[in-house]
Amino acid sequence: MNFELLATDGKARRGRLTFPRGVVETPAFMPVGTYGTVKGMLPRDIEDIGAQIILGNTFHLWLRPGTEVIQRHGDLHDFMQWKGPILTDSGGFQVFSLGAMRKIKEEGVTFASPVDGAKVFMGPEESMAVQRALGSDIVMIFDECTPYPADHDVAKRSMELSLRWAKRSKIAHGDSPSALFGIVQGGMHEDLRLRSLDGLQEIGFDGLAIGGLSVGEPKEEMIRVLDFLPPQMPADKPRYLMGVGKPEDLVEGVRRGVDMFDCVMPTRNARNGHLFVDSGVIKIRNSVHKHDDSTLDPTCDCYTCKHFSRAYLHHLDKCGEMLGSMLNTIHNLRHYQRVMAGLREAIQQGTLAAFVDAFYAKRGLPTPPLDA
């Protein structure tokens, strides 16, 4: 992987990631393909909406169908017929999400499989081996996602464990040609975040992610971390904010120097009839749309907006037709890609402030302040 920083506007960065499988323009949003599929989307649909990289889930693919099945096809790209780059998360967040079903020790995590209840163990070495088998273009270290809230002592122990696991992940990654990203932890504590960052830089990674956000903390806390952390991260490596978020969150992350994002929100909300447009969110199942023959978003160039009315989308949603979820997903993911394309162009042109002001004005919101 090669990362080029092409332009800056304030803290915001316009860059380019180059892989053997393709180029990713940054800032970038990565659709989430948990089980080797972006729900409701054919691979050609993902290309059509402008996504250049997607995310796969190490934990779930390891448990089902398993790496042996996937490797019979070659790797995850071949299995799901996606030609572009794939980032795989390490499984750490999913293990964290199991709560009482898992036991964390120095060696790794033992847990009951959510598939069949069997006792399963995963540590840094296992995570790296699975991601290598998947043929990931970007591999994430195995870490512990610090819970929220966590006092200083709890967050410190968690962060230090993640650093030890980061070293083991780097060793286990070995001579793999895939990029390896570290993950900054430390909860909401600035000193721990900076110690985590220093430790990861000593180990050496191809890129760095910000983990442990969007885990239940108030948005103000997330913004506070994003105000102080990205400026401390190396300028010559990509910065990835994990699991975030709404379009507004992407804009605020980019304003603070983040390059990469992923989130299930656009796909999950699409299946629930919540559709993102420039003015905010349209709840397509509401009865007000039953007789509305207008397009969902006249500014959008997606297949859904080019061909179907709000009334038709409302009808599909009320009937529970799978086509409704598919068309909604196409639109939501295209909306996210359009936001990212607008951010990239604005940074390139040095007009980010105007873009952000217009973005919020369309939503009837004031532009949030930005620390210098």
From Swiss-Prot:
Signal peptide: none annotated. Binds 1 zinc ion per subunit. Pathway: tRNA modification; tRNA-queuosine biosynthesis. GO terms for molecular function: metal ion binding; tRNA-guanosine(34) queuine transglycosylase activity. GO terms for biological process: queuosine biosynthetic process; tRNA wobble guanine modification; tRNA-guanine transglycosylation. It catalyses: 7-aminomethyl-7-carbaguanine + guanosine(34) in tRNA = 7-aminomethyl-7-carbaguanosine(34) in tRNA + guanine. Substrate binds at D89, S90, G91, G92, F93, D143, Q185, G212. The keyword Glycosyltransferase applies. The active site is at D89 (proton acceptor), D262 (nucleophile). GO terms for cellular component: cytoplasm; cytosol. Zn(2+) binds at C300, C302, C305, H331. Its EC number is 2.4.2.29. Keywords: Glycosyltransferase, Metal-binding, Queuosine biosynthesis, Transferase, tRNA processing, Zinc. Residues 243-249, 267-271 are annotated as: RNA binding. It comes from the Bacteria. Belongs to the queuine tRNA-ribosyltransferase family. PANTHER family: QUEUINE TRNA-RIBOSYLTRANSFERASE. This is Queuine tRNA-ribosyltransferase. The gene is tgt.
